[in-house]
Amino acid sequence: EEGGSPPPVVI
């Protein structure tokens, strides 16, 4: 998982 903006969407 990577942090970001917007945050990653977990499917």
UniProtKB/Swiss-Prot annotation:
State the Gene Ontology terms under molecular function. peptidase inhibitor activity
A GO term from the CC aspect: extracellular region
Kindly state which keywords UniProt assigns to this record, in alphabetical order. Answer: Hypotensive agent, Metalloenzyme inhibitor, Metalloprotease inhibitor, Protease inhibitor, Secreted
**Does the record carry Phosphoprotein as a key word?**
no
Domain of life of the organism in this record? Eukaryota
Q: Where in the cell is it found?
A: Secreted
The answer to whether UniProt assigns keyword Secreted to this entry is yes
Tissue specificity comment: Expressed by the venom gland.
Any GO BP: regulation of blood pressure
Q: What does this protein do?
A: This peptide both inhibits the activity of the angiotensin-converting enzyme (ACE) and enhances the action of bradykinin by inhibiting the peptidases that inactivate it. It acts as an indirect hypotensive agent.
The text of the family note is: Belongs to the bradykinin-potentiating peptide family.
The name under which this protein is listed is Bradykinin-potentiating peptide 5
The organism is Bothrops neuwiedi
